[in-house]
Amino acid sequence: MKKLPLLLIALFLSCTLVSAWDVNKKYTGPKTPTTDTTWHPDILSGYEARYVNQGEAFDGPCRSTIIRKLNRKGSRKAFLYVHGFNDYFFQGEMGDRFVDSGFNFYAVDLRRYGRSYEPWQYPFNIRNQEEYFADIDSAIAQIRRDGNTDITLGGHSTGGLTVAFMGAMKGKDVGVDRIVTDSPFLEWNFNSFMRNIAAPTIGYFGKMFPNGKIKQGHCDGYAYSLLKEYYGEWTYNTDWKMVYSPPVTMSWVGAINRAQSKTMKNAKKISVPILVMHSSRKIDGCNYTPVFQTGDAVLDPFMLQKRGEQIIADQQKEQMKRAGKKVEKISNPNILGSQVCAIDSGLHDLILSEKAHRDAAYDTIFSFIRHHLQN
C-alpha cells in the first residue's frame, strides 16, 4: 500500500505528460553504418573532424565525431570538450583560446548529436548515460595516439554530468589528468516534489516505456540570449542546437536520474582534481528579457554549488583515508586541489557569456590547469 501513491503519480504523469509512441517510426530507409572514418575538414574553419563507428545501439548503428585543432608548436597537452543537451561543438573561440594557450584542442559530438546525428535516430536520445563513455574513450584514445601526455577532460551541462559520472565510475581508470565542468547537470532545476518524486518515477517507467515523450516548455529566453540574430553573440546550426528544445524521452529522464545519483554516491572514487564552475545567479522565466544575459536560465547554480562541494568533500575524505590520516583532522581539505567556483553573472554555458564574464571563466580554467601542471 505504501507504493500506491507513487504508482498513482506515475500513472497520472504517464497519461498527462507523455505520449508513448515509437520515436523511430518516421524513418523507413536503410540504417547503414558510416564507412568513411578518415580526417576531413570540419564545418568550423581551421578544424578537422572524423567519425568513429560505435557499433550497434538500441536504435541501430551509431557514431561519434572527434573534432580537433592542433597547436603548431608541438604541444603534448590536450583539452577535450564534451557538449551539453540540445547542443554540439560550435565554439570555435574556445578551441582557438586553448590552442593559443599552448594546448591541442579536441571536442566530441556524442552519438545522436550534431555531426554524429543519423536520420533514423531521435535527437539526444539515450538509455543509459554510460553509453557516452565509449564516445569519450574513443576521443581520449585519439588524443593519446596524437602524442599527448597530459589530458584535461571538460564538459558542459549534461556533458559536465557525464564527465563527472565517468570519473566517479572509472576511478583511476578514467584516463585523464583532471576534470573541468561548466554548469554540470548534477541536479534538476525543479521543486522538491518534481526532483524527488516525479522525475524518478518517470525515469522508473522509462525502463518499460523508453520511447514515451515528455514535452519541454516553449521558452526562447536562453536561446535568444545566445543567438546573434536575436540578442547574443553566437552563430550556430539551429537544427542541431534548437531554439525550442524537443520533447525528451522517458528513458532520457531515467538515464539522467541514475547518472546524477551514481555520481553523488561514488564521488569519493574520483581520483583526479575536479573543477566545478557555475554562475553566480539564477534566472527564472521563459521568454527573453535582458536579465537572461546575467545568469543561468537553465539550472540552479546554488544547487550546483552544493552538489559540487559535496563531491569534493567526499573525494577529499577518501584521499585522506587512503593517506592514513584522520578525516576530522583535515587542515587543508583540498588535498587534490579540486575547486568549486562561481562565475559572476555567467550564462548557463559560461564560455558563451558576455566577454568579461567568459574571460573570467577561461581564467579560472587555465589557472586550475596550470596549478596542476606545476605540481
Annotate the PLM regions.
Residues 76-84:
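Short beta-strand element of the alpha/beta-hydrolase
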Residues 214-338:
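Serine-hydrolase catalytic core
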Residues 87-90, 95, 99-120:
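Conserved alpha/beta-hydrolase
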Residues 317-375:
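Catalytic active-site module of serine/aspartate enzymes centered on a nucleophile-bearing elbow/loop
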Residues 23-73:
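N-terminal cap/lid segment of alpha/beta-hydrolase-fold proteins
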Residues 1-22:
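Bacterial Sec-dependent N-terminal signal peptides
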Residues 158, 162-250:
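Alpha/beta-hydrolase-fold enzymes
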Residues 85-86, 114-150, 356-361:
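Catalytic nucleophile-loop/oxyanion-hole region of alpha/beta-hydrolase
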